[in-house]
Amino acid sequence: MPFTLAHPAAVVFLKNKKFNFTALILGSMAPDFIYFLNFRPYGNLGHQILGFFILNLPLCILLAYIFHNFIKSPLISHLPRPLDNWYGYLRTEQFGLHSWKEVIVFIYSALLGMITHVLWDGFTHKTGFFVRHITWLRQKIIIFGGEEIYIYKLVQHTSTVIGIIIVLFFLYKLRDSNTRILWGHKSFKDKFIYDLIVIITAIIVLVLSYIIFKYLSIPYGIGNLVVSSINGIFIGILIASFKK
C-alpha cells in the first residue's frame, strides 16, 4: 500500500466550497489510522465500510478539532523562515461544525477521502480488489540489477513517490509569498525549544514502543519503526503546541 502521507494527493485538488478540505485530507489517510493506534501496520478495520463509520469518521472529527484548535497556529509560527511567513495567513482560518449542513459536508468529504484511499490501495496491495481481479498486476517484471518485482508493488512504490511530489507541489502553491507581515514570528530560541520537544518526545515514544513490543514478544520491523516514529512526532508536536 502507498505511504499514508501520500494519499492526500488524491484529494488536494478538490479544494472548493462543496467539500470540507480538512475532512478530505484526513479522510484520505483515515483507513491507515488503525495502524497508528496499534503502533504497527496491523489491522484492516479502517479499510472496511463498518470501520469507515465506527473508527475512521470519529477519528477524523477528533483530529480535525485537535489540529485546528491546538496544533495549527503554533506549528505554523514555529516553522523555519520563510515558511512561517508563507503559511502565516492559514493561522486565522476558522474551523468548526456549527450547523447540520457543515456536519454533513464534513462527513461526505471524509468518506470521499476514505474511498480514494481504498481505491488506491486496491491497485497496490496483494489482497487489493483490482490486484485480485486484474491478472497483469500480479505478474513480475525485471528491474535494475536483474531483480524481479510484482507489478502491483512497482505501482505501489511509484505512486507513493508521485503522491508525495503532488502533495509537496500543492503545499508550494498554497504559500503566500507576497506576505510581508510576520504572523506571530517566533525567535530562534522559541523554535529551537519547540523542535527539541518534538524530537525528544519522538525518541521517547520510539524507545518505549520498541521495549513494549519486545516485552510482548511481538516482532518489531521497519513498519513498526515508521509508524512509531510518526506517532512520536505527532505526540511531540501536540505537546510542543502547549509550550509558552
For the regions a language model picked out, list residue spans one by one.
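N-terminal membrane-targeting hydrophobic helices
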Residues: 1-244
